[in-house]
């Protein structure tokens, strides 16, 4: 009933510390193993998640994931207007567009509250962001996008593939997959279940 991999065996027989608590959703051992993995990523897709807190005790967070596999930098900002958070997002988009010109960028904004203002602002600015990134790329290639004589050459410079996505994290739950014994009540629980499954695998 309690094999060598169980915490009962570890504590009572081997005299070791348990690897998880009975009520843990995600075992610490899985997290520790996951931090040791080296994930090579082509950086063809960049997701930027934005959770807006505005003036509360919480922080607004911008979080980057490459190819749905590897985390990038985390930016945290306190006591900012939604327009300021939009500005931080635009800077981040431009920074990653310059560093990874072949990547598509998907900005996912939590719109279950204050984030809807950031979403609206970014969605409204989308064409201007794409244009500004394209002009920067032209200049990087030694071209002047404002010079009519270089217009034809500038057309060979690729535009940024940018997506602004409205997300709602309080939605319906379900199972991570058909074999999952756990039915999650909402999308937040489902998200944690997916993380748990990835770490377990």
Description of each model-found segment:
Residues 6-7, 54, 115-118:
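Short coil/turn motifs at helix boundaries and re-entrant loops, enriched in small/polar
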Residues 41-66:
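Gly/Thr-rich phosphate-binding beta-strand-loop-beta motif of the actin/hexokinase/Hsp70
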Residues 68-201:
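Mg2+-dependent endonuclease catalytic cores in nucleic-acid-processing enzymes, primarily RNase H-like
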Residues 14, 63, 165:
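Residues in well-ordered beta-strands of folded domains
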Residues 40-41, 55, 100, 157:
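Generic structural signal for beta-strand residues in well-ordered domains
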Residues 1-50:
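ATPase catalytic-site recognition across NTP-hydrolyzing enzymes
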Residues 17, 52-54, 111-113:
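Short, flexible loop/turn elements at secondary-structure junctions
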Residues 4, 8, 57, 186-190:
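Charged, alpha-helix-enriched surfaces in structured cytosolic catalytic cores
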């Amino acid at each position: 009933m309690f094999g060598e991999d169980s915490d009962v065996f570890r504590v009572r027989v081997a005299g070791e510390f348990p690897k998880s608590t009975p009520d843990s959703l995600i075992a610490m051992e899985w997290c520790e193993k996951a931090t040791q993995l080296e994930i090579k990523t082509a950086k063809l897709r960049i997701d930027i998640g934005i959770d807006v807190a505005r003036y509360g005790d919480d922080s607004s967070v911008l979080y980057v994931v490459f190819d749905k596999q590897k985390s990038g930098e985390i930016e945290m900002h306190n006591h900012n207007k939604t327009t300021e958070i939009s500005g931080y997002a635009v800077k981040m988009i431009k920074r990653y567009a310059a560093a990874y010109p072949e990547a598509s960028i998907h900005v996912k904004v939590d719109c279950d509250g204050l984030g809807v203002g950031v979403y609206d602002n970014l969605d409204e600015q989308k064409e201007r962001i794409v244009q500004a990134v394209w002009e920067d790329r032209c200049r990087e290639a030694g071209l002047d996008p404002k010079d009519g004589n270089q217009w034809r050459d500038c057309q060979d410079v690729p535009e940024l593939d940018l997506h602004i996505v409205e997300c709602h994290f309080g939605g319906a739950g379900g199972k991570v997959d058909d074999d999952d014994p756990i039915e999650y009540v909402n999308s937040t629980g489902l998200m944690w279940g997916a993380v748990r499954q990835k770490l377990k695998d």
